[in-house]
Amino acid sequence: MQKFLSLIIVILILYNIVKLKISPDNNNPTTIEQTASNNSSTDENQTSINNEPHISLNGNLFERTVSKIVINALKTEEGKAFFENILQPLNGPINPNDYTIEVRKDLVKTLFKINTLGSGNIGPASCGHVVTVFYQISDMNNTLISEDTKTFTLGSAPVMLGLDNVIIGMMVGEAREAIIPAKYAVNNSKNIIFDDAYNYKVNVILKSILPQNFVKNNEVKIYDDEIAYRVPLLCGEKVSFNAKITRLSNGKILYDSKAKGQQIDMKIGDITYPLIFSYALQGKVTVGTRSVIAEGKTFKALGSNINKIISHESLPINEYLLLELGDFKQN
């Protein structure tokens, strides 16, 4: 039923786009301005109160109703993430042995409206890294609320959970500007409190990353066997899942939580788990199986010699391994 509704919505969206493309341009700016100038004073007052432009909807009652739902949904961050997803292939499992949907879309960047400025050559920062940043947080009217230089572990959310996720992927020296939706303004500090009823603007500059163990985007391949319209997992959130690690050179299974009969319960960014786990989980929608091909060195944990999954001594660090993550349950 969910797939059918998704298909209907996508068809209606495409249908309306085609109608707009082939229909005469009766709503050009000049016509709109002329019509507006002839409106009554009551209409002008109403327009001044509501700054959003009026959208004329065509079609039958059902088409207009669906169009209104789509427009209202796109006004929310979750709604935008929803449509970012359904405009990719419709969610549905494919052959579990044939991972053909390569992950290219970063839903986290869409969710936080991230804009990157400048460049750097050290990084990128992953969930679990210790970073030093300079940040500024303002309200949506650009009134400065907080600014500081702070060192913390990504995922610990000492300032704002959304800030941690904006920093993910940054290089040292880069700057980013973003908008943090209200629900991600939470933190684990008793000294910093933000009203979770409002969105916030963030500017951040990355000054340093420790340790300098990095997962390079061009050295890792990530595939999903299913795509769905949900808000993705974020750095600092908790999730349960099954994991399987296979050595590609000979097919030897190095770890399998399902065979052990116990799911992994992990906070994304936990430095006692392999770095590649946090890298692969951040931004993942909790359906299907995510398959990751990466070098063994990325399976090291950031926290000294502690690795809850596989000992560093037994890791083939210079070989490629296959990591499979599935059976997700968000805590």
UniProtKB/Swiss-Prot annotation:
Presence of keyword Translocase: no
Gene Ontology BP terms: protein folding
Signal peptide residue numbers: none
Coiled coil regions, renumbered to chain: none
Protein name: Putative peptidyl-prolyl cis-trans isomerase RF_0616
Catalysed reaction, written as an equation: [protein]-peptidylproline (omega=180) = [protein]-peptidylproline (omega=0)
Record domain PPIase FKBP-type: where: 128-226
Alphabetized UniProt keyword annotations: Isomerase, Rotamase
GO MF annotation terms: peptidyl-prolyl cis-trans isomerase activity
EC number: 5.2.1.8
Database matches in Pfam families: FKBP_C (PF00254)
Region annotation (Disordered) ranges: 28-50
